[in-house]
């Protein structure tokens, strides 16, 4: 953890950029006064948390202290201030991959950009799996990109250890808490909750779903009822990349992104009739062809039988990544154009909800989870010292 002081007076809270955790959490852009560096501060009202919520937060902080990898979001400081848990992390100037496809790449990113992003995520997953954990929440909103184009995996709150009494378990059975918003990304074996359990290969399925999300502009199974989604996955329905090889040619002449939604098992967030500045319809947004290596990569990740899915380490050697010739920090900023990272904070006032980041009021990257009860007042058994990691 970086040498940032665990003292709230060292941080000037600026624009609110997100809320979550049953509205018990507020996320601020902040300035670290000793260095002038801009950071993100997540503040959780502990007095309103249930004991279960506190235990959940303790688990995340334990993992954040344990992990140390260049593709996992580092926690700069964690501490208690006036009955609030403060978590300080770097400010990610490009936001999350979900932010990018919602605001700029509504019909999907380029294949090369996706390759760079997924390579970073797989490196993080390979590390997490070797540490004996399952991530259980791989999705675009948990993939963050820094100002210099580096890729980071977040969402550590959902991590589950597969080590019990010093022994690595073959499978686990725990269903992720507060997981309603992550259901489309979860593997069939996690969803079915049977005695067979699941292991780290469940994260590989989530990689396949995330690849489709980044390529198609929307997550497969979007807005599908939970029961139907479960049946589709258990019956072996496999989402795909939307391009000229998966969409009938006659539909590609319709010049809409909505016509092909069923093939991706979801509905695109793009406007139905895409029009140019002169009012004329443009070409169909999915009139493109992804490489056979990309299709194969997704197919391997989405195998119904987890035993047939490659490990994260094996996937890093997949031919899909041979197109990568440079470091992500060199290539991604170019591939994400015309998007530019947020680096100008002039005019951003303390606690100003309409400041420079007003456009990202509900950044999905920071929407932690939803729960059901917050009536029980928590008792911090180990005191504030536990939280100062």
UniProtKB/Swiss-Prot annotation:
Using the UniProt record, give the first listed, main subcellular location.
nucleus
Keyword Phosphoprotein among record annotations = yes
Molecular function as annotated in GO: ATP binding; protein kinase activator activity; protein kinase activity; protein serine/threonine kinase activator activity
Q: Which GO terms describe its biological process?
A: activation of protein kinase activity; protein export from nucleus
Q: Where in the cell is it found?
A: Nucleus; Cytoplasm
Q: InterPro entries attached here?
A: Kinase-like_dom_sf (IPR011009), Prot_kinase_dom (IPR000719), STRAD_A/B-like (IPR047173)
Similarity section: Belongs to the protein kinase superfamily. STE Ser/Thr protein kinase family. STE20 subfamily.
Subunit notes for this chain? Component of a trimeric complex composed of STK11/LKB1, STRAD (STRADA or STRADB) and CAB39/MO25 (CAB39/MO25alpha or CAB39L/MO25beta): the complex tethers STK11/LKB1 in the cytoplasm and stimulates its catalytic activity.
- Protein name per its UniProtKB record: STE20-related kinase adapter protein alpha
**Which taxonomic lineage is given here?**
Eukaryota, Metazoa, Chordata, Craniata, Vertebrata
Coding gene? STRADA
